[in-house]
């Protein structure tokens, strides 16, 4: 039984162009070495689309793609903005959820991970979509309140105060996680 820390969409282009995202950088940056020292698998998830748009589905993704290189695969804006170590995993996604069309579940299962702590932006998008996918797959879930943000703070608060707890998630701050129980094995969601 082990845990993974999911760090979603904290990439250069997003941090540079969406001011609300900057608030999560200090607590997540402080958390990373503690999580690694506790034996937690750190997984960075980034978003990028093919330059020719072959992987676009729907207007939301097309709108991101039209922003130019900001979301084009291989562009500097799609690179993880925080320090990535050799033991970390980086997953490329082309949809909102970190699980949709990626090998994230395969990596987590191969490492014996049964519990996830979620951070990233935006709370109502990447974090929520990944949360629902992870819950459906039977992972125990913790959402790190100050490690997530949304353009509308009220939406963020609604998710972390109402939605995520109603689905069985533990809500903590980055400073409170990983608790000792998380490194030895965390509770899992009902399967």
Predicted segments with their positions:
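Von Willebrand factor
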Residues: 35-54
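Short, well-structured N-terminal submotif of metal-dependent ribonuclease cores
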Residues: 22-29
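Active-site-adjacent betaalpha module
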Residues: 1-4, 30-38, 66-191
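Acidic/polar short surface loop at catalytic or gating sites that assists cofactor/ion binding
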Residues: 51-71
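Short acidic, Gly/Ser-rich segments with clustered Asp/Glu that frequently serve as metal-coordination loops
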Residues: 12-16
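Acidic-leg catalytic submotif of subtilisin-like serine proteases
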Residues: 4-10
């Amino acid at each position: 039984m082990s845990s993974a820390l999911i760090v979603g969409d904290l990439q250069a282009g997003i941090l540079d162009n969406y001011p609300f995202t900057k608030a999560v950088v200090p607590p997540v940056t402080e958390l990373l070495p503690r999580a690694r020292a506790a034996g937690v698998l750190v997984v960075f998830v980034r978003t990028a689309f093919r330059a020719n748009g072959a992987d676009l589905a729907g207007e939301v993704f097309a709108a991101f793609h039209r922003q130019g290189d900001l979301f084009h695969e291989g562009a500097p804006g799609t690179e993880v903005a925080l320090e990535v170590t050799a033991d970390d995993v980086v997953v490329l996604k082309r949809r909102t959820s970190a699980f949709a069309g990626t090998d994230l579940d395969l990596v987590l299962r191969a490492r014996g991970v049964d519990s996830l702590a979620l951070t990233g932006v935006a709370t109502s998008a990447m974090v929520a979509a990944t949360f629902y996918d992870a819950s459906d797959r039977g992972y125990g879930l913790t959402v790190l309140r100050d490690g997530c943000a949304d353009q509308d703070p009220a939406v963020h608060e609604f998710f972390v105060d109402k939605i995520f707890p109603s689905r069985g998630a533990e809500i903590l701050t980055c400073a409170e996680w990983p608790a000792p129980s998380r490194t030895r094995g965390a509770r899992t969601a009902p399967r």
